[in-house]
Curated annotation (Swiss-Prot):
Component of the acetyl coenzyme A carboxylase (ACC) complex. First, biotin carboxylase catalyzes the carboxylation of biotin on its carrier protein (BCCP) and then the CO(2) group is transferred by the carboxyltransferase to acetyl-CoA to form malonyl-CoA. It catalyses: N(6)-carboxybiotinyl-L-lysyl-[protein] + acetyl-CoA = N(6)-biotinyl-L-lysyl-[protein] + malonyl-CoA. Keywords: ATP-binding, Cytoplasm, Fatty acid biosynthesis, Fatty acid metabolism, Lipid biosynthesis, Lipid metabolism, Nucleotide-binding, Transferase. GO terms for biological process: fatty acid biosynthetic process; malonyl-CoA biosynthetic process. The lineage of its organism: Bacteria, Pseudomonadati, Pseudomonadota, Alphaproteobacteria, Hyphomicrobiales. Acetyl-CoA carboxylase is a heterohexamer composed of biotin carboxyl carrier protein (AccB), biotin carboxylase (AccC) and two subunits each of ACCase subunit alpha (AccA) and ACCase subunit beta (AccD). Belongs to the AccA family. Residues 39-293 form the CoA carboxyltransferase C-terminal domain. This is Acetyl-coenzyme A carboxylase carboxyl transferase subunit alpha. Pathway: Lipid metabolism; malonyl-CoA biosynthesis; malonyl-CoA from acetyl-CoA: step 1/1. The gene is accA. Its EC number is 2.1.3.15. InterPro entries: Acetyl_CoA_COase_a_su (IPR001095), ClpP/crotonase-like_dom_sf (IPR029045), COA_CT_C (IPR011763). Gene3D superfamilies: 2-enoyl-CoA Hydratase, Chain A, domain 1 (3.90.226.10). It is an enzyme of class 2 (transferase).
């Protein structure tokens, strides 16, 4: 069953009418309503296109968090063959908020990293809603080092509200783990591509996203703090989250304009959750294109290109 966001109410009402008419037709009362169904379907499609062509930053935030939006597990299944996950940080334990390992992407060996939020109550708890602990970032460093050792590209899929802020995580060195992961990502001698598929929240996101090429899905967000968090700090009022989202410039469109990201991956009309298969296909094409631009670069050239990219961001903003 499709889940609608509050601002999608006009579309929801039209699509509900379409389903009612289809149910009436299937009842076999001899009623011919094909023309009316087609008219309403066209109207609903046009309303959806108009709505998603003019989303506010806050509405994009809600779309990025949509419960039916495809997550890392969906992308991994659709993009990679022979995915072999690796577990544990070899220091404390396993953190399933970050998943990573070896795989093949369109016939080529790669390393893969990504945040997994989970899609059911059970899996959300198991994956800690995609909020990684220190051991998750230390596992990420392990996988980056393997990519470096074998000279194979690293693909990161980012989808987190932020690193886990719990007491245990802080006691085990959360800030240090994020810093080392960010440093390892920047120092990688193999080419890397990061794609923000949903939320890109603060250091928890950038720890695996300091890549040669940074891409974003059309309705993803990428920010130093959540709109609610910014509102609570700036105005002491989370009700101002919509205003914060606008002022923070968190959308893919704004970030491309500022040179923070390199490309935007188009989503189907109505967002990724309406057609996950098409979304994942478009993401795969964008990742393949980004990797092709890095092909032929040796380790020093890859590092220099990445370093220059992020230094340029700092100078231009």
């Amino acid at each position: 069953m499709r889940s609608y966001l509050d601002f999608e109410k006009p579309v929801a009402e039209l699509e509900a009418k379409v389903e009612e008419l289809r149910a009436l037709a299937s009842a076999g009362d001899g009623v011919t309503i094909t023309d009316e169904v087609q008219r309403l379907e066209t109207k609903a499609r046009e309303a959806l296109l108009a709505l998603y062509a003019n989303l506010t930053p806050w509405q994009k935030t809600l779309v990025a968090r949509h419960p039916q939006r495809p997550h890392f597990a969906d992308f991994a299944k659709g993009l990679f063959e022979d995915f072999t996950p690796l577990a544990g940080d070899r220091k404390f334990g396993e953190d399933e908020a970050i998943i990573g390992g070896f795989a093949r992407f369109r016939g080529e060996a790669v390393c893969v990293l990504g945040h997994e939020k989970g899609s059911t109550t059970e899996t959300r708890i198991r994956h800690n809603f995609g909020m990684a602990r220190p051991e998750g970032y230390r596992k990420a460093v392990r996988i980056m080092e393997l990519a470096d050792r074998f000279g194979i590209p690293l693909i990161s899929l980012v989808d987190t509200a932020g690193a886990y802020p719990g007491i245990g995580a802080e006691e085990r060195g959360q800030a240090e783990a994020i810093a080392r992961s960010t440093d390892a990502c920047l120092a990688l001698g193999a080419p890397n591509v990061a794609l923000v598929i949903g939320e890109g929240g603060s250091g928890g996101a950038i720890a695996i996203a300091t890549a040669n090429k940074v891409l974003m899905m059309e309705h993803a967000i990428y920010s130093v703090i959540s709109p609610e968090g910014a509102a609570s700090i700036l105005w002491r009022d989370t009700a101002k989250a919509q205003e914060a989202a606008t002022n923070m410039k968190i959308t893919a469109q704004d970030l491309l304009k500022f040179g923070i990201i390199d490309a935007i991956v188009k989503e189907p009309p109505g967002g990724a959750h309406r057609d996950p298969e098409a979304t994942i296909g478009a993401a795969g094409d964008a990742i393949a294109d980004a990797l092709s631009q890095l092909a032929g670069l040796d380790g020093p050239a890859v590092r220099k290109a990445r370093r220059d990219k992020f230094l340029a961001i700092g100078r231009s903003l």
